[in-house]
Swiss-Prot record:
Residues 20-36 have a biased composition (Basic residues). Residues 1-11 have a biased composition (Basic and acidic residues). It comes from the Viruses. The keyword Thylakoid does not apply. It comes from Porcine astrovirus 1 (PAstV-1). Gene3D superfamilies: 2.60.120.20. Residues 1-72 are annotated as: Basic. GO terms for biological process: clathrin-dependent endocytosis of virus by host cell. InterPro entries: Astro_capsid_N (IPR004337), Astro_capsid_p (IPR022027), Viral_coat (IPR029053). Residues 1-64, 648-698 are annotated as: Disordered. This is Capsid polyprotein VP90.
Amino acid sequence: MASKSGKDVTVKVENTNGRGRSRSRSRSRSRARNKNVKITINSKPGASGGQRRRGKPQSDKRVRSIVKQQLDKSGVTGPKPAIRQRATATLGTIGSNSSGKTELEACILTNPILVKDNTGNNTFGPIVALGAQYSLWRIRFLRIKFTPMVGQSAVTGTVVRASLNPTATPSSTGWSGLGARRHIDIVVGKAATFNLKASDLSGPREGWWLTNTNDSGDSTLGPSIEIHTLGTTMSAYQNGPFTGGLFLCELQAEWEFSGYAANPALLSLEKNRDDDAEVSFDGQQGEPLTMVVAEDSLFNKVATRRSTFTRGIARDGQTKSETIWQVVDTAVSAAETVVPPPFGWLIRGGYWFVKKLAGRTKLRNGKQTSSYVCYASYQDALSDKPAICTGVAANFYAGRTETARANLHFTQMNEPSTGVGETPTAFRMYRAAPDDIVYLRFKPETVNISVSPAARLFLARKYTAHSLKVKGNSGTTRIHCVVKVNDPMWYSPDWEQVAQPGPIPGVSLLGGTTTIGIVTAAYQAHMWGLHIATAFIVQVTKDINPACSTSCVLTKELNDQHLKTVAGQTSFNWSLRAGETYLMMSFGAHTSAVGEWVWNDADISVGYTIYNSPLTPCLLLTEGSFHIVLPAKRGLIPLASTELFTVRDQDSIPQTTEPPAEEDVGDNETEDESDDEDLDHFDLHDSSGSEPEDEDVENNRVTLLNTLVNQGVDLARAAKISKRAYPTLAEKTRRSVFMDSLIAGCGPSSAWSEACKAARKVSFKEPISESRGHAE
């Protein structure tokens, strides 16, 4: 701003909050509300200046410099920049239009830690490095440069529009609505530049934005630049669709940073693309909208590796990750038609935000899939407000959801832990347990059959159609009984929820001669004598109705603790549906050595005894609102006797090679006293009589554990109560000898050594040599 010589230039900046000042209010009160900055510039040069430029007006540049200096001093422009960096970032290519509709080709976020290309090269540049070191950022200017990759005469039918979205929030804006924004139209084949000023990109804090994306979304992301195409891209030379890239997109900008605050983890946020990915959407009325992708897809692999989950076990199995991902679909396809209402517009808009669900793998169209909760904005994802469906998709039914192909460009938006991972000073003790064992907690249900009553469990003796067998590389096992698995949840030996195991290689379910399912886990236990009990957790991939001509039912005689089979009254059919999970059991005899997997292809006979095992509740409790816990292996490996029961709690049991410290004895006594009240409610063990067999003790533990779990007791707590209520003979001997030795004056090390030696003698496991680490 300039003026004539000899006159003043006055700049007045008013920052008024609310309505104008009332005359009745005092002057002091009005000054507290309104902040006015008055700058007066004398445009008449001084003596020294007049000698050099006599009679010439001041330049606009000098006036702007003085105004900016005064505004900075008054504090209305926020903190002073600590560093300024100008850089050019290559963002990737702008693809062609394949549908003729408005397609989103790119969504460019201006936050410096998110300025990366989508080629999977996640090395950081100077802008990302500075963004991870400072808490505030703003942009002085920004240019989006479009370099054509094809000639103007090579393709026809498509126009490109780049527009500014100040809120970086998905919307259902059409082509006309994009024209109402700050935008530029680009002709294919010609270079173009989209210029934006600082006033277009200013943030809510005197023009500044926050860098850490873990903070509120409306003050961190900054504006976004969306690039859309309209019209099918056709090749002028081949008279067919053109599928290549149209432009190379580059971002040129100058960032300013202030407020040093190092967050090193923000350097490694990932950005990549997954072309031609299979995507589907689930959701029923009142439930969150979920995106389902193949478990072996690039997006799911990256998201699984980088996601951070809240520790603990959710009741509904829907533990959400704390890591948020932006998903951009650059291929408008049938995806929007398979979305439950009312969020078809969200998918049609081209991008949304998701969080990964833990332990929610499903079988869909013969493939393992993972689920992600969808959010309509980044702020909704931070505050965990998912998109809630008001109905289901028109073509939706269980296990048969339609999938669509999509080109997914995904960006990791945040990192829950922003510091450098250091060596922990406290370690958690894990018990030594094989990695191949898992525990399945589920609600059993009788499979629908064609005879009455339907709730009764039937065992198949003779098949007439679609005989069920599990086939492996070295044999087959005939299925005698089927139970439907509802609400499955998988746990590790430390009672931490884990994902569903993958298919066992080389093992499948046959219906006659046709493969109809995959086996994800197996159970086999050697019972008394030569008897074995086998079970498979199977996911059926095809609908089938196995038919049996003769059947068996279960009975229990008086004073007999085991089950027996008796002849059934009629034939029956099982009804198995694709996408469902079933527990398929088989019983028989074996002649192989203990520890080897046994294949049993024989029919079950009338009068066969089924001895008590963890499978017994699955045979008896086949309806009701309760859950059963069953151990299983990820391969064809029989369960050892110590793995059959889920109530082992070795964290509180010292190893035989290391004696407990003196304070550990006191802790154990305190735990015993604290558990007295719980044990009184479940006093199922009579210590006054003879010692029960260890196998009966284990069976009683399982029964008590299931009872406690059904009554709402935590799994770990139920396991501890069951273990203390039914100790084995070796455990009783070890504790008795240990306490007697302490009373006799022995030290803790010597007492524990004697106790372990006595326990090994009771269990017939005498070691070859004694441990050298314990003095007698």
